[in-house]
From Swiss-Prot:
GO molecular function: small ribosomal subunit rRNA binding; structural constituent of ribosome
Entry's family note: Belongs to the bacterial ribosomal protein bS6 family.
Protein name as annotated: Small ribosomal subunit protein bS6
Coiled-coil ranges from the UniProt annotation: none
Pfam families membership: Ribosomal_S6
GO BP term (any one): translation
InterPro entries: Ribosomal_bS6, Ribosomal_bS6_sf, Ribosomal_S6_plastid/chlpt, Transl_elong_EF1B/ribsomal_bS6
GO CC, any one term: cytosolic small ribosomal subunit
Organism annotation: Rickettsia prowazekii (strain Madrid E)
The protein's role, per its UniProt record: Binds together with bS18 to 16S ribosomal RNA.
Keyword Cytoplasm: no
rRNA-binding recorded as keyword: yes
Lineage, highest ranks first: Bacteria, Pseudomonadati, Pseudomonadota, Alphaproteobacteria, Rickettsiales
């Protein structure tokens, strides 16, 4: 198993409940294949650098995961098929830090996003 960091952008008009359902679907795939979710972060609704389709903003979500390459391919396949996800990127990492990501550290306290860190030894 290897560490991966995955960031995906969900359309701006998707509700927070629907975002939770999307993330739960990915979580189920990971756990069903003996993977581990080390860190989940919702980075909030952010303005995109350029318009993607009709979207000027998007909900950013980060997953720090420990999975096999086959599970990574399955997650990416599901992301491609989900019409609510407008962009995604998954990269291999040496390790996943339990600290909040730099994006969370730079955000103002009035927009406090959700962070869920689980370290399994």
């Amino acid at each position: 198993m290897s560490f991966y960091e995955s960031v995906f952008i969900i359309r701006q008009d998707v509700s927070l409940n629907d975002i939770d359902k999307i993330v739960d679907d990915f979580t189920k795939i990971i756990k069903d294949n003996n993977g581990t979710i080390i860190k989940k972060e919702y980075w909030g609704l952010r303005t995109l650098a350029y318009k993607i389709g009709n979207n000027k903003k998007g909900h950013y979500y980060f997953l720090g995961i420990d999975i096999t390459s086959n599970v990574k391919e399955e997650l990416e396949r599901k992301m491609k098929l989900n019409e609510n996800i407008i962009r995604f990127l998954t990269i291999k990492a040496d390790s996943i830090s339990s600290e909040p990501s730099p994006i969370l550290k730079n955000q103002s306290t009035e927009n406090t996003p959700v962070i869920d860190v689980t370290i399994n030894n």
